[in-house]
Amino acid sequence: MDTAMQLKTSIGLITCRMNTQNNQIETILVQKRYSLAFSEFIHCHYSINANQGHLIKMFNNMTINERLLVKTLDFDRMWYHIWIETPVYELYHKKYQKFRKNWLLPDNGKKLISLINQAKGSGTLLWEIPKGKPKEDESDLTCAIREFEEETGITREYYQILPEFKKSMSYFDGKTEYKHIYFLAMLCKSLEEPNMNLSLQYENRIAEISKISWQNMEAVRFISKRQSLNLEPIIGPAFNFIKNYLRYKH
């Protein structure tokens, strides 16, 4: 049996501003439209021969609505929930055939529904720093800038990269190691107005994002307590760096 550890790397940009109304540093966070567990299941990133506890844990980490969607056994609806109208027909066909082989052909989905019924609690939709996977031959910083614009609509001329800051964090989930690398940027004054409504201006730019907003450190701590991904160890040092940067700048 293949036990090799997989490494998945994402690169992100922590972009900050000083909110002049309350004199607090804020950063842009985006909320995913679906849970990581739901995405992993739909893309068949699991072993059908794994112990049932691993599969039940995957369903535990889905939202209630996602579990209900899987129980319909309607793969088209599940796929649409992630990809919407994105044309990825070859990938769809490959994943559908695997879903059909794993769950529909053996017993018409009875085992799958039984496993879902054993799930307890409910997962949450993650708030995270805008990030994504690097393209082939793409530098880390270029990837961070590209992904940030794709997820927020804010282009390169509106912020300044602070090259002295670069942090990474890793965590493990079964056979997969997830590594996130982050750069830091400071927003230019032309976009620092506290009333700038990112939720309305950039919402639904891409299929995977449902919300986008400015968050201060108190909000980051609150969010981190309610989800599996703890943002405080990365955003905390970034905010401290920004404080020192602003102190010496002025």
Swiss-Prot record:
Predominant subcellular localization, coarse grouping: host cell
Binding sites annotated in the UniProt record for Mg(2+): 138, 151, 173
Pfam families membership: NUDIX (PF00293)
Top-level taxon: Viruses
Domain Nudix hydrolase residues, every copy: 97-243
Induction: Expressed early and up to late in the infection cycle.
Cofactor: Mg(2+); Mn(2+)
Active site (record annotation): 147
Keywords: Early protein, Eukaryotic host gene expression shutoff by virus, Host endoplasmic reticulum, Host gene expression shutoff by virus, Host-virus interaction, Hydrolase, Late protein, Magnesium, Manganese, Metal-binding, Multifunctional enzyme, RNA-binding
Nudix box (motif): residue ranges: 132-153
Example of a GO cellular component annotation carried by this entry: host cell rough endoplasmic reticulum
PANTHER family: BIS(5'-NUCLEOSYL)-TETRAPHOSPHATASE [ASYMMETRICAL], DIADENOSINE 5,5-P1,P4-TETRAPHOSPHATE PYROPHOSPHOHYDROLASE MUTT
Family statement: Belongs to the Nudix hydrolase family. DIPP subfamily.
Subunit structure, as described in the record: Interacts with host RPL23A.
Function of the protein: Decapping enzyme required for the removal of the 5'-end m7GpppN cap tethered to viral and host mRNAs to allow their decay in cells. May therefore accelerate viral and cellular mRNA turnover to eliminate competing host mRNAs and allow stage-specific synthesis of viral proteins. Acceleration of the turnover of cellular transcripts may even promote the shutoff of host protein synthesis. In addition to the mRNA cap, g5R also efficiently hydrolyzes diphosphoinositol polyphosphates.
UniProt protein name: mRNA-decapping protein g5R
Naturally occurring in which organism (per UniProt): African swine fever virus (isolate Tick/South Africa/Pretoriuskop Pr4/1996)
Lineage: Viruses, Varidnaviria, Bamfordvirae, Nucleocytoviricota, Pokkesviricetes
